[in-house]
């Protein structure tokens, strides 16, 4: 765990090292993934079955989950879990419903009609991780924006190691209205969604997080299909003053550290004594935390505490780090928030732990990682929509602007472009 002070002579060098820290998988899986994708593309269901048997030790007659099986598994959830899923779905839906954009259409001063129509994607694949990362919240965060956008066909893949699945995942799928679900995972699931098999019709876009093999598979099928992003390890940056309870902040830092040994948790504070209290609280919690093996590895190898002269000094540092999650645990957090240009999502004030956003705050928890918040945003309704623009010229409009189009086409050395306009202008002149 790294402790930095902005007053230290070597701060700039050490901070830049932190900024450039690459926490993605160091093992190159591209060759293995390329082989899996090629095999799935060539052999379809047989290849999917082969890899599922090898990696998940599961060989069902069909990977398609029946409505009866989904209902049976979902019914295993307690009433409390079902109610929590329904509340989360309600809040996520409400926030994303407000994102729906309006079409644009107008006629300009020369009579040209111009416009832009928003059109939903036809079919989308949602990858839901299995094993340790089998999260019902991921189902809601990926499926509900697609449903609200108007996607007609939503396909979900989720691995079932040894034939087992978290019932809450299927309960979330029920609530989100996802009915086409296949018990496959890994690069083979991405290949099946992208290329199709005898039983799985290919989709237009694939969204959802996964391990290094899933991430690489999404990278390789991009172009054949669209993808949301290449997800890296989780990140949280907490800006906190000494008025906070250090134990609260320690729990916040560990909330991301427990995701992955490569996750990163950073505290920025203007109080050295408070920083030490938080470090002590983290170490104390780790002695009893059930996920301590993962969280300890993350905290020791990638955690950081940065002590600044004042909290205003945190802003340029934060914008360079461009973290996935940012907590502003201060009074009047909007003052700092208004200066933040590079972050996946903000959690404002002392009573908004990032975990609220993970589950049921409303905004999406699928967020840019690995400093991609410099240029990317979290998943939203817009990820499931396309924009189609249109133009319509009447005779007068074409006569008003056509000759300039001819001039530009001739300047670019494209005579057929020029001719397609010129013949119409000539025809109008001959009328």
Curated annotation (Swiss-Prot):
Gene Ontology cellular-component annotations: cytosol
Pathway(s) this gene product operates in, as recorded in its UniProt entry: Amino-acid biosynthesis; L-histidine biosynthesis; L-histidine from 5-phospho-alpha-D-ribose 1-diphosphate: step 9/9
PROSITE patterns to which the protein is assigned, alphabetical: HISOL_DEHYDROGENASE
Binding site for substrate: 234, 256, 259, 325, 358, 412, 417
Matching InterPro entries: Ald_DH/histidinol_DH, Histidinol_DH_CS, Histidinol_DH_monofunct, Hstdl_DH
Chain residues that bind Zn(2+): 256, 259, 358, 417
Pfam family, any one: Histidinol_dh
Top-level class of the enzyme under EC nomenclature: oxidoreductase
An annotated GO BP: L-histidine biosynthetic process
EC number: 1.1.1.23
Cofactor note as given: Binds 1 zinc ion per subunit.
Catalytic center residues: 324 (proton acceptor), 325 (proton acceptor)
Stored NCBIfam families: hisD (TIGR00069)
Role according to the record: Catalyzes the sequential NAD-dependent oxidations of L-histidinol to L-histidinaldehyde and then to L-histidine.
Protein name: Histidinol dehydrogenase 1
Origin species: Trichormus variabilis (strain ATCC 29413 / PCC 7937) (Anabaena variabilis)
């Amino acid at each position: 765990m790294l402790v930095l002070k902005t007053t230290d002579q070597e701060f700039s060098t050490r901070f830049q090292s932190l900024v450039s820290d690459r926490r993605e998988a160091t093992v190159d899986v591209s060759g293995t993934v390329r082989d899996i994708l090629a095999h799935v593309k060539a052999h379809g269901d047989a290849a999917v079955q082969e890899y599922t048997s090898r990696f998940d030790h599961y060989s069902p007659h069909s990977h398609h989950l029946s409505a009866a099986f989904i209902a049976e598994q979902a019914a295993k959830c307690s009433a409390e879990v079902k109610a929590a899923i329904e509340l989360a779905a309600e809040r996520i839906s409400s926030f994303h419903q407000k994102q729906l954009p309006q079409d644009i259409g107008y006629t300009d001063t020369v009579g040209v009609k111009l416009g832009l129509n928003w059109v939903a994607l036809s079919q989308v694949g949602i990858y839901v991780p299995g094993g340790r990362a089998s999260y019902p919240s991921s189902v809601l965060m990926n499926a509900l924006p697609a449903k609200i956008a108007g996607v007609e066909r939503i396909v979900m893949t989720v691995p079932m190691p040894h034939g087992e699945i978290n019932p809450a995942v299927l309960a979330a799928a029920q609530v989100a209205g996802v009915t086409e679900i296949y018990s496959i995972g890994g690069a083979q699931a991405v290949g099946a969604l992208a290329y199709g098999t005898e039983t799985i019709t290919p989709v237009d876009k694939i969204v959802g997080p996964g391990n290094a093999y899933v991430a690489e598979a999404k990278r390789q099928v991009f172009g054949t299909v669209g993808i949301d992003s290449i997800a890296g390890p989780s990140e949280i940056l907490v800006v906190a003053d000494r008025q906070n309870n250090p134990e609260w902040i320690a729990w916040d830092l560990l909330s991301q550290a427990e995701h992955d040994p490569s996750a990163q948790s950073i505290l920025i504070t203007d109080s050295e004594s408070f920083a030490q209290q938080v470090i002590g609280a983290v170490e104390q919690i780790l002695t009893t935390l059930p996920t301590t093996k993962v969280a300890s590895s993350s905290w020791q190898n990638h955690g950081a505490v940065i002590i600044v002269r004042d909290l205003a000094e945190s802003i340029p540092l934060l914008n360079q780090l461009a973290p996935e999650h940012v907590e502003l645990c201060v009074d009047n957090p909007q003052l700092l928030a208004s200066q933040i240009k590079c972050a996946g999502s903000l959690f404002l004030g002392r009573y908004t732990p990032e975990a609220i956003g993970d589950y049921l705050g409303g905004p999406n928890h699928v967020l840019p990682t690995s400093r991609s918040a410099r240029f990317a945003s979290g998943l939203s309704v817009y990820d499931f929509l396309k924009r189609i623009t249109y133009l319509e010229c009447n005779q007068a409009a074409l006569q008003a602007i056509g000759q300039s189009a001819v001039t530009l086409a001739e300047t670019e050395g494209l005579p057929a472009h020029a001719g397609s306009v010129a013949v119409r202008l000539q025809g109008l002149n001959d009328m």
